[in-house]
């Protein structure tokens, strides 16, 4: 059968050849490592800006008010709140889309595959919160127990990318699955424990919008515009309700259909393509494009649109808006003895390393799950330590947990210090112990070869 090679891009070529991006650069930008580098650069820029002679402009800029109004209704927030309440809804929508896809068609369908990272994530949620609460048992400081409960997936996967082939693929899968379960826990904490002053009207409108999205699913609506319009209404309703508006992104991500297309939908595409080949006109082009799009779940198409925006725009801007901690001598001396700073740092480093590794080993030893492939206990410990890099969601919860700016500054210093130590310690553990400890689940990656049927005879020697 003759294979047809598709052109690199559809449509006629340009008359003027534009410079092409190197394949290595394209591959880098397509990975989590690219987003992690941008986030790191944004955080460094925020720190330099906040500690420069122009530090006052940092606070003034993010305190600038921006208004979005339609008639008598509208939203009036500072740029800082637009980033945290508005733009971050896109980030959480991507998280919800990934969770929904993994549960529908991905790795989260297999109980034994998800058991180890799921139990590890639970350990990584409970122990850090417990360590922080032991250090801060009372007063407004105790509200920060949710800060060290999250893992920054972009940073962790970015660090693993530096190891290249030496890092088992199954370890990346373990961390991605752990991050998904971890995000579910962090989102639940935000929705339940960091919400107050509920508005019944806003909740009612939000509930009706969720029902409308479910109705779109039931009707098998595959086009994206109805879901996007409902998402905007849901965001506004949840923002008015008093629940943190980013929950709208999570709900939309979970509700957008991720079910693979039916066989008859795929079989329809060649029909429209043949009709287009017979007579190329705008109507038939539209039908062929629509038929092709209908074969891709709405979840995948929306994620393809939102993921680059989230990784390369939203998250770096969030880092720029929230990582600007004042690191003068007075602030560092206060942080060195602050129970908030010490509690956050200790919980991120020790809580995640111990909680995830102990729970993961327990799941393996009890037979609840397995870590197949070349994953060793040294890899598990190193990955658990890297999971202590809690940047994006930790900074996000800090803004919700504390109203006192001094406590926010102390928590952010703890996040920066704890994440830095966790990154260095995890990298060292992976390099030193990664290949020197036993396999977590030996003989589970490949089936054991069967013996040939009896009678067994020695091969006849050649004459």
Swiss-Prot record:
Residues 449-463 have a biased composition (Pro residues). It is found in: Cell membrane. Keywords: Antiport, Cell membrane, Ion transport, Membrane, Sodium, Sodium transport, Transmembrane, Transmembrane helix, Transport. It is a multi-pass membrane protein. GO terms for molecular function: sodium:proton antiporter activity. One of its GO terms (biological process) is regulation of pH. The chain crosses the membrane at residues 28-48, 79-99, 114-134, 144-164, 173-193, 196-216, 232-252, 305-325, 344-364, 377-397, 413-433. Pfam families: Na_H_antiport_1. Residues 444-463 are annotated as: Disordered. Its main location: membrane. It catalyses: Na(+)(in) + 2 H(+)(out) = Na(+)(out) + 2 H(+)(in). Gene3D superfamilies: Na+/H+ antiporter like domain. GO terms for cellular component: plasma membrane. Na(+)/H(+) antiporter that extrudes sodium in exchange for external protons. Belongs to the NhaA Na(+)/H(+) (TC 2.A.33) antiporter family. This is Na(+)/H(+) antiporter NhaA 3. It comes from Frankia alni (strain DSM 45986 / CECT 9034 / ACN14a).
